[in-house]
Regions:
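Conserved PLP-dependent catalytic core of the aminotransferase class-I/II
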Residues: 65, 69-137
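Cytosolic Rossmann-like ligand/nucleotide-binding regulatory domains
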Residues: 141-142
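Solvent-exposed alpha-helices and their adjacent loops that cap or buttress functional pockets
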Residues: 16-20, 30-33, 147
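Short hydrophobic/aromatic beta-strand micro-patches
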Residues: 41, 115-117, 156-158
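PLP-dependent enzyme catalytic core of the Aspartate aminotransferase-like
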Residues: 133-134, 145-173
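Conserved core segment of the aminotransferase class I/II
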Residues: 22-26, 33-85
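Active-site pre-lysine segment of PLP-dependent enzymes
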Residues: 1-24
Length: 173
C-alpha cells in the first residue's frame, strides 16, 4: 500500500527507504495510537511460523477485545485524517527549530518523543514539578532508566499542540 505521508519521520519515504524488499513490518500501538500491544505483518508463512514458535506470543495473554476495538478506531482516525500526520511533522520541526534558538540540549530525533539532557536527577525532578505547576507536562527520566549523569526530561509533541503551546513550553524551559 502506498505511503499516505512522507512528512512523518517514521515513514519510509521520509528516510529515503523503499519497502520493496522488507520481509516484515513491526510496530506498537502505544504512543501515537494511544492503546497498547504490538504487531508484526508479513507473509502467511512468516506469520504461521511466529504463531507456532514465538514464545512471547504463545505464552502471553490475548489483548482484550475492548483494546482491539479502541486500536481499530484510533487507526481509522489516523488513516482518515492525513492532516494530523502533517501537523505532527510540522510541530516536531517547529519544536526543534525553536529549541535551537533557546540553546536547549535536545536530541537529534525527529520523532514525537523529544528529550532534553540535563545530567542531574534533582534538576530533572525540579523541572518536572515546576512545569506541572504551570500546567505543562514533561517527564523526568532518571537513572537507572538512563545512564548516570544523563538524566533528562521527556516531552511528547502531538498534532493537537499549537505553536503557542510549544513556544510556551520552550520559554519555560
Amino acid at each position: 500500500k502506498k505511503e499516505k505521508s512522507s512528512k512523518l519521520p517514521s515513514s519510509f519515504l521520509y528516510q529515503g527507504l523503499s519497502n520493496n524488499n522488507i520481509d516484515a513490518y513491526m510496530g506498537t500501538f502505544g504512543k501515537a495510537v494511544g492503546t497498547f500491544g504490538s504487531f508484526i505483518s508479513g507473509s502467511k508463512d512468516l506469520i504461521d511460523l511466529l504463531v507456532q514458535k514465538s514464545k512471547p506470543y504463545i505464552y502471553s495473554t490475548s489483548i482484550p477485545p475492548s483494546i482491539v476495538e479502541a486500536t481499530r478506531a484510533s487507526l481509522k482516525i489516523i488513516i482518515k485524517n492525513k492532516s494530523l500526520n502533517d501537523r505532527l511533522a510540522e510541530n516536531i520541526k517547529f519544536f526543534k527549530d525553536t529549541a535551537k534558538l533557546y540553546n536547549l540540549n535536545i536530541n537529534k530525533s525527529m520523532m514525537p518523543i523529544q528529550t532534553i539532557t540535563l545530567g542531574s536527577p534533582e534538576l530533572a525532578m525540579k523541572i518536572q514539578k515546576l512545569a506541572l505547576d504551570k500546567k505543562l507536562f514533561v517527564q523526568a527520566i532518571r537513572y537507572p532508566t538512563v545512564p548516570k549523569n544523563k538524566d533528562l526530561i521527556r516531552i511528547n509533541i502531538t498534532s493537537k499542540h499549537t505553536k503557542k503551546h510549544i513556544k510556551e513550553l520552550l520559554v519555560f524551559l
